């Protein structure tokens, strides 16, 4: 269901604003496809919890893709959140928004983003960490790099950068310099 909804949603990219007129794709029949599961012979787990609640679980690799700006994920993707949680929240507003008070991410505020990354790197019980971020995030590349180096085994921290096209309603954007960043380290 999570994979099918975006192909029929009457939106431009986020669920907090719907199109005024019905887009052609919203008339498509929603196809539910069984996801292909490839066994690697290991005991894998996928968790749907706040990151702070799972830092004490052992794992080989922790992959984190936290918000990198002040726009909260929950209001922009509230339909997908409701599907993932399979709950029945009280809805409000024209777009049927769920109440997300008390769930705002510390990664979405410049004053708390450093303090959100610190426990992620310090307290997790994994061998490797891979963080997806971008060079225009609320925490600077230098700050996040120094924090990663603080918790990395010597000479294991790497920062990879890739050019990234800014999404602006299918209109090419002339502003250059947006980079997708992957921070990789082996934990001490």
Predicted features and spans:
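Short, glycine/charged-enriched secondary-structure capping and boundary segments
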Residues: 76-79, 144-146
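Class I S-adenosyl-L-methionine
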Residues: 141-148, 152-188
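Accessory, usually C-terminal, subdomains that scaffold auxiliary metal cofactors
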Residues: 72, 79-87, 105-108, 150-162
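SAM-dependent nucleic-acid methyltransferase catalytic core
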Residues: 1-77, 85-103
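Structural motif
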Residues: 63-65, 130, 184
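Feature marks short, surface-exposed loop/turn motifs that line or immediately flank catalytic pockets
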Residues: 70, 137, 166
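A generic structural signal for alpha->beta connector loops
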Residues: 43, 126, 154-156
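Conserved Class I SAM-dependent methyltransferase catalytic core
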Residues: 106-152, 161-162
């Amino acid at each position: 269901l999570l994979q099918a909804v975006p192909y029929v949603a009457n939106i431009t990219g986020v669920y907090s604003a719907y199109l005024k007129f019905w887009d052609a794709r919203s008339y498509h029949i929603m196809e539910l496809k069984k996801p292909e599961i490839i066994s690697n012979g290991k005991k894998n787990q996928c968790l749907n919890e706040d990151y702070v609640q799972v830092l004490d679980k052992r794992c080989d690799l922790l992959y984190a893709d936290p918000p990198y700006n002040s726009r909260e994920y929950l209001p922009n993707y509230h339909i997908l959140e409701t599907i993932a949680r399979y709950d029945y929240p009280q809805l409000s507003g024209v777009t049927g928004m769920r109440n997300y008070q008390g769930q705002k991410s510390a990664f979405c505020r410049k004053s708390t983003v450093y303090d959100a990354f610190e426990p992620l790197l310090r307290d997790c019980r994994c061998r490797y960490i891979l963080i997806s971020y971008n060079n225009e995030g609320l925490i600077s590349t230098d700050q996040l790099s120094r924090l990663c180096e603080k918790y990395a085994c010597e000479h294991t921290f790497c920062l990879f950068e890739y050019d990234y096209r800014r999404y602006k309603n299918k209109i090419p954007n002339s502003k250059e310099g947006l980079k997708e960043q992957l921070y990789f380290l082996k934990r001490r």
